[in-house]
């Protein structure tokens, strides 16, 4: 009598990420740098790299001035990230140059939650976010602590791409009255339900009132501005 060989037991997610260098018999020999990123995937669809200490034991020098470029280049082409929907990269000195590489990725097409807080994007980086087709699905956008001023804020407010955003956090930037007024007058951010502009030098009562009474932001339920 022929006996069917027992089927191979499928591995769970935790077993996969701890499966040596082959990661679930996929035959992929990840570099230590790639392994650190792979192990930063949470719940299969969330990439969470909250600081550069993730890479301390990999041999990759996160203090290198080119670290943001190297990280962006790897993420943009790293096949396991094709199912990622939430992208969280904070405290990694991510700048506009790195962001240009990231938004050209053919892999990261499903991002709907984007957190790039505590980096070095500046106005140029904000403009790249605003113009990137990669982010058309984003509903939650966190760009706190990035040195973004009125020009970058205007780019976000007039973006033809970020029309699905319902939650926007710009905490501790340099939005100012000018940037706040741009958001208040935004047609493209009309779906906002939550807006945090704390620590943004929004001083004038005119700007604050414009946000509170904006005929554009009719869905807004939570506004924090100080």
Residue ranges and their predicted role:
Residues 54-56, 61-73, 93-100, 120-127, ...:
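Short, solvent-exposed loop/turn at the beta-strand->alpha-helix junction
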Residues 117-118, 124-170, 179:
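Eukaryotic tandem repeat interaction scaffolds
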Residues 47-49, 87-89, 114-116, 138-143, ...:
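Conserved hydrophobic beta-strand positions in leucine-rich repeat
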Residues 189-226:
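Leucine-rich solenoid repeat scaffolds
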Residues 2, 82, 221-223:
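Alpha-helical solenoid scaffolds in eukaryotic macromolecular assemblies
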Residues 171-193:
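Short, positively charged, low-complexity/disordered linker segments
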Residues 6-113, 117-120:
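LRR N-terminal entry segment and analogous cap-like coil->beta motifs
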Residues 33-44, 73-82, 101-109, 128-136, ...:
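Leucine-rich repeat
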């Amino acid at each position: 009598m022929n006996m069917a060989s027992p089927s191979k037991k499928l591995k769970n997610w935790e077993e996969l990420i701890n499966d040596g260098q082959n990661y679930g018999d996929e035959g992929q020999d990840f570099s230590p740098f790639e392994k650190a990123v792979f192990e930063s995937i949470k719940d299969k669809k969330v990439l969470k790299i909250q600081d550069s200490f993730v890479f301390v034991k990999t041999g990759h020098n996160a203090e290198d001035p080119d670290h943001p470029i190297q990280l962006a280049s790897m993420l943009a082409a790293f096949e396991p990230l094709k199912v990622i929907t939430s992208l969280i990269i904070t405290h990694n000195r991510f700048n506009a140059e790195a962001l240009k590489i990231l938004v050209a990725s053919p892999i990261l097409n499903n991002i709907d939650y984007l957190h790039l807080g505590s980096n070095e994007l500046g106005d140029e980086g904000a403009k790249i976010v605003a113009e990137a087709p990669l982010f058309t699905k984003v509903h939650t956008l966190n760009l706190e602590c990035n040195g973004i001023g009125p020009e970058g804020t205007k780019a976000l407010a007039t973006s033809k791409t970020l029309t699905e955003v319902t939650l926007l956090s710009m905490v501790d930037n340099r939005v100012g009255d000018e940037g706040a007024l741009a958001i208040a007058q935004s047609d493209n951010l009309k779906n906002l339900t939550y807006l945090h502009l704390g620590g943004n030098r929004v001083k004038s009562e005119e700007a604050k009132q414009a946000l509170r009474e904006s005929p554009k932001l009719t869905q807004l339920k939570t506004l924090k501005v100080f």
